[in-house]
């Protein structure tokens, strides 16, 4: 059976029914008691792979829960689905395309066929092209129109052409190469362009225009603005090729813009935008951290690919995380998932994972077009650790929703200040511990009495200090963020998303919902500027158009 042609209805499997019954058995399950009853629980539910240490012991599971979840994966023929992706089958059924971002991190000598053609020589040709360009820039050989070396590289792109590269560039800032600064321009808001341009010198700035079609509205508008700025600063049309390169499958449009053919890096239909940081879309990453570190990033992702393909499901990090996500979404009613990195350099990981997860699994029909019979992708949210503790962690602890969380933390800091990192690590662990333990009414009352409060005051305050606990979380620990470990971490989440899509029977690699807003946006714009007088499809939109037109002044 081809999953992408005849998706499975997992809700009809015996293992799904067994999990539903098992969920009722766990109605009164308490993690706090489970740790007391089983001194080996942490050892049983934690292990290392690819430079990552996963502790999943603070979950609403027993060993038989894990066994049932693994049985679900086996009955859903997850192994076949994994093999189909890596073999280049057209698992993106709606667009009839293979999904081969994994090919971008495979070593020389491997063979991957697309329509009978081995794509690996082309993958490594482009990687070599990237290596040469990065070397020219870092060695001061790529020069602007006044013969000054490039000092600033600006990536113009949005979505997958922005979120992944920005995450990696920021996460690996300790590896940044001296002499070249990297910036990102994504939003069509003119204020973003203005603030960035104020910090740049046109003589020493190189723009990378990243757009598969070379027609993405936000990217093209920003590229045109950058072009106009360059010319206004004294640049010439004849020398424009020194300041603009492109990553696009539309070579003709890039050349028409003024970019030389040899400076147009290709994109392939078998790599989706949110999975593209491993391709030439990752040029700003390589510009920032150097090509050798970029290759380390690829190597770490490749290690995770191997782990995903070969590790038994019960010791397979992306498979386990995917199964736990289904467990909470479909059997416990969880509708969101928090990503909580306790590392300043990982502050953008939540943004990337929002696109990766929600654009992939935010679907309501299966691969064959029939409605889903289960839940699908959760809302992904969160942010950098300690800041969240003073903001939304309150909801995690005492809110009415069950919200699973992933804590991500390094053992060592690149920038140790006194005992700051020990406190950071302690905060991470204590938050996951507090979510699990909670605080009972008896404990709250005892705490208040110990402070000498009158009994009436104890009874008044105690209900507010009760914390339910039993809130699930995973903790991912790395020794220190490196290119290799970061590659493994990002690939881990990519594969987790795919695992869940298989169990839900959906296509994780299209995004038709995104297209509707783009289509309607053209009509709204035409009405805003007065080139279309026909009213909008609804009174609300038309009213807001009229409000804008009545007040807008340039």
Curated annotation (Swiss-Prot):
Protein EC: 5.3.1.9
Coiled coil: none
Superkingdom to which the source organism belongs: Bacteria
Gene Ontology CC entries for this record: cytosol
UniProt cross-references to CDD domains, sorted A to Z: SIS_PGI_1, SIS_PGI_2
Any one GO molecular-function label of the UniProt entry: carbohydrate derivative binding
Keyword terms, alphabetized: Cytoplasm, Gluconeogenesis, Glycolysis, Isomerase
Main localisation: cytoplasm
Annotated compartments: Cytoplasm
GO annotation (BP), single: gluconeogenesis
A Pfam family of this chain: PGI
Known function: Catalyzes the reversible isomerization of glucose-6-phosphate to fructose-6-phosphate.
Protein name: Glucose-6-phosphate isomerase
Species: Pseudomonas paraeruginosa (strain DSM 24068 / PA7)
